[in-house]
Regions:
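N-terminal Rossmann-like FAD-binding beta1-loop-alpha1 element of flavoenzymes
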Residues: 5-31
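Active-site substrate-recognition segment that forms the wall
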Residues: 21-26, 35, 48-49, 86-91, ...
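Dinucleotide-binding Rossmann-like beta1-alpha1 core, especially the glycine-rich loop
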Residues: 48-132, 294-296
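Short beta-strand to alpha-helix junction loop
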Residues: 64-67, 98-106, 144-163, 282-287, ...
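Helix-loop-beta segment of a Rossmann-like dinucleotide-binding subdomain
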Residues: 86-97, 110-117, 121-168, 273-277, ...
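Helical element adjacent to the flavin cofactor pocket in flavoenzyme catalytic cores
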Residues: 144-197, 201-205
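C-terminal catalytic lobe of FAD-dependent flavoproteins
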Residues: 299-392
């Protein structure tokens, strides 16, 4: 095991592997530490949607970041596939967003604003919506289509990031937990990490990309990182005889968290629930019932489709549902990239590029300034910063 690198990354999910890839492009020596298998947590459990434009949404800083992530993906996929040798299943499927009655009056003016900004958005009558997707349930009020929205196969995407990083010379250590940290004499720099293998890995820079487990990293640093796991359950069904053509979103008719996404393997993914149940990744009967109830109310034909599989993953969520991106206060060489919630896939490339720009130039990119951890992150231990750590 190589025991030193310019940068150590804690977390081998889609964010950690993306950062590793972009760092290697800049020539930095990189080691990624992952407590389980590479990309086996939220990255592999996601639906892989690249669809941030909800009807009536506004372009606040988080939406600006999401839109940048969407634009970056379409141009970045050929590069990633070429370097990794892995296809990521990118499809610009477009979305069909089904509207409740209370959104109809405002949506036309909203759509015109976004159309003027260059997005291909259409407001549909019920009959036009049925033409796009004939097996929708009756009684629709209207819909919005957004051509730019897309999807990928998340398992293949995280594998591509990891393989691309490896092909450029990064080192990825699976089943390697951090158990303690080494500090500089002044105590404001991390100089290395001890692992459960008994190795001390030294570094100039530490990046925390541990997803739902990021709060545990905070205990090493004497701070509270406000990231918690939120379970999302999903079901894959076999396609109905009249196939689902677009990613369909319920925009508040029954449950605005529910979507139906057709996949290249002939399945339709229905997601996703949200549950604060700690690190429990079991699939609940109630979650399955809710997903199938809403999905079959939107597309009755799904009631006759065989279940292909069911699964759950943990999203890293912050109190304001915005990511933490940037330097950790009071530490000279620690950066966090976590808390992406359900947008980790969408934001993977833009996060990797922006974090690498920060690390290599020392300047915080303007687009991530709103997400830099604030000085008021709670000190939950004491002023001298703990050296021990829980394995993540």
């Amino acid at each position: 095991m190589k025991c030193s690198a310019d940068v150590l990354i804690v977390g081998g999910g889609i964010i950690g592997c993306s950062i590793a890839y972009f760092l290697r492009k800049q020539g930095a020596e990189v080691i990624v530490l992952e407590k389980g298998d590479i990309g086996a947590q939220a990255s592999s459990a996601a639906a892989g949607l690249l669809a941030p434009i909800r009807p009536l949404c506004q372009r606040d800083p988080f939406k600006v970041l999401q839109l940048a992530g969407l634009v970056r993906f379409s141009s970045f996929v050929p590069e990633l596939e070429a370097v990794s040798g892995i296809t990521v299943g990118y499809e610009q499927t477009g979305t069909l967003r089904l509207l409740p009655a209370e959104k109809l009056d405002a949506v036309q003016a909203w759509a015109e604003v976004w159309q003027h900004a260059g997005y291909h958005i259409e407001v549909l009558t019920p009959q036009e919506a049925y033409t796009r997707q004939p097996n929708l349930s009756s009684g629709l009020y209207g819909a919005v289509t957004i051509a730019e929205e897309a999807q990928v196969v998340p398992v293949q995407l995280v594998q591509a990031y990891a393989q691309a990083a490896l092909n450029l010379g990064a080192l990825l250590y699976a089943h390697t937990e951090v158990v303690a940290l080494q500090r500089s004499e002044r105590g404001s720099r991390i100089t290395g990490l001890w692992t459960n293998q008994g190795d001390l890995l030294t570094c100039n820079q530490l990046i925390l990309a541990a997803g739902a487990w990021s709060a545990r990293c905070g205990t090493w640093l004497g701070i509270k990182l406000p990231v918690r796991p939120v379970r999302g359950e999903l079901i894959a069904l076999e396609q109905p005889s009249l196939p689902v053509r677009h990613i369909i979103f319920d925009e508040g008719i029954f449950d605005e968290d529910i979507y139906i996404a057709p996949k290249l393997n002939g399945t339709v993914v229905v997601g996703a629930t949200k549950a604060d149940v700690g690190f429990d990744t079991s699939v609940s009967a109630g979650g399955v019932l809710h997903l199938l109830t809403v999905a079959t109310q939107l597309l009755p034909a799904l009631a006759h489709c065989p279940i292909h599989r069911m699964w759950a993953g943990l999203r890293p969520k912050t109190p304001d549902s915005r990511p933490l991106l940037g330097p950790i206060p009071s530490w000279e060489n620690v950066v966090i990239a976590s808390g992406h919630g359900g947008f980790g896939v969408l934001l993977s490339a833009i996060t990797g590029e922006m974090v690498v720009e920060l690390v290599t130039t020392g300047t915080i990119p303007e687009i991530i300034r709103p997400f830099v951890p604030k000085e008021n992150i709670v000190d939950e231990v004491n002023s001298h910063k703990r050296e021990d750590a829980q394995g993540i």
